[in-house]
Amino acid sequence: VAYELIRAHPAAPLGLGARELARLGRGIASWGEVDCFAVYLAGPAWRRRQVPDSLILGWARSGDRWWRRAALVSTVPLNSRAQGGSGDRGRTLRLCRLLEGDRDPMVAKAMSWALRELAKRDPGAVRAHLEARSGALPALVVREVRNKLETGLKNPGRR
């Protein structure tokens, strides 16, 4: 609820920096908590350059699966029109390359989401990334992202 209140307040999101995000993210331990934190707070703050790339890269290097997931999910607002993003191939693909060997299901699913969101803005870059890195990426990521590029759906058999 706190994340939603901050997101809905006109000025509160503009006051978020590294210290505030650390405090608000303390104890995140489920996909729901992480995704709300990253989509509502961390990603938009990163998109607005209120926090440095080094903060998000630090999360990606964390031993905690939830912080690694938060790093990847924070790319969604960079690329989502609904979140105010205009597309950020560089930061998104940098995180994906950093975490491509991570086989934790929560991290792999977040990478799939990050790449599928970028594919809406820059399908050529995502296609090239898949071609170059498919051997290093989790199979789930390759399958879901390729499906998105080819059919527009993550799981085309589940309409």
Model-derived features with residue positions:
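Alpha-helical scaffold domains
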Residues: V1-R159
